[in-house]
Amino acid sequence: MEGNMGFITITKPALKQIAILKNDHENDVHLRIGVRQGGCSGMSYSMNFEHVDKLKDTDERLRLDNFSVVCDPKSLLYLYGLSLDFSSELIGGGFQFSNPNASQTCGCGKSFSG
């Protein structure tokens, strides 16, 4: 089953990889997806596990079977419509971000401008 937050879609392969990575963390964590300044195109994607105590009232949240994905409102402006996928290919593998709001992306796909 894909995860759809209404603003971010997470594919089955991405959900599977997130679940694998989550196993390396304690149980009381969620995955935070966001953007930050930096990267070759001006902004870069961020994904990290953080303790659920850090959840803010303004965060958007998607509850899945064994974890939650959250996003802050400022990042949401840049991520609306984002599709998060995962590829296990040797070249070009890893998490892949497809962002309809990005006017320009860098070659690695991890940085964009909006």
From Swiss-Prot:
One of its GO terms (biological process) is iron-sulfur cluster assembly. Gene3D superfamilies: HesB-like domain (2.60.300.12). Pfam families: Fe-S_biosyn. One of its GO terms (molecular function) is metal ion binding. Keywords: Chloroplast, Iron, Metal-binding, Plastid. Fe cation binds at C40, C106, C108. GO terms for cellular component: chloroplast stroma. It is found in: Plastid, Chloroplast. It comes from the Eukaryota. Its main location: plastid. The keyword Repeat does not apply. Disulfide bonds: none annotated. The keyword Metal-binding applies. NCBIfam families: iron-sulfur cluster assembly accessory protein. Belongs to the HesB/IscA family. Ycf83 subfamily. This is Uncharacterized protein ycf83. It comes from Pyropia yezoensis. The lineage of its organism: Eukaryota, Rhodophyta, Bangiophyceae, Bangiales, Bangiaceae. The gene is ycf83.
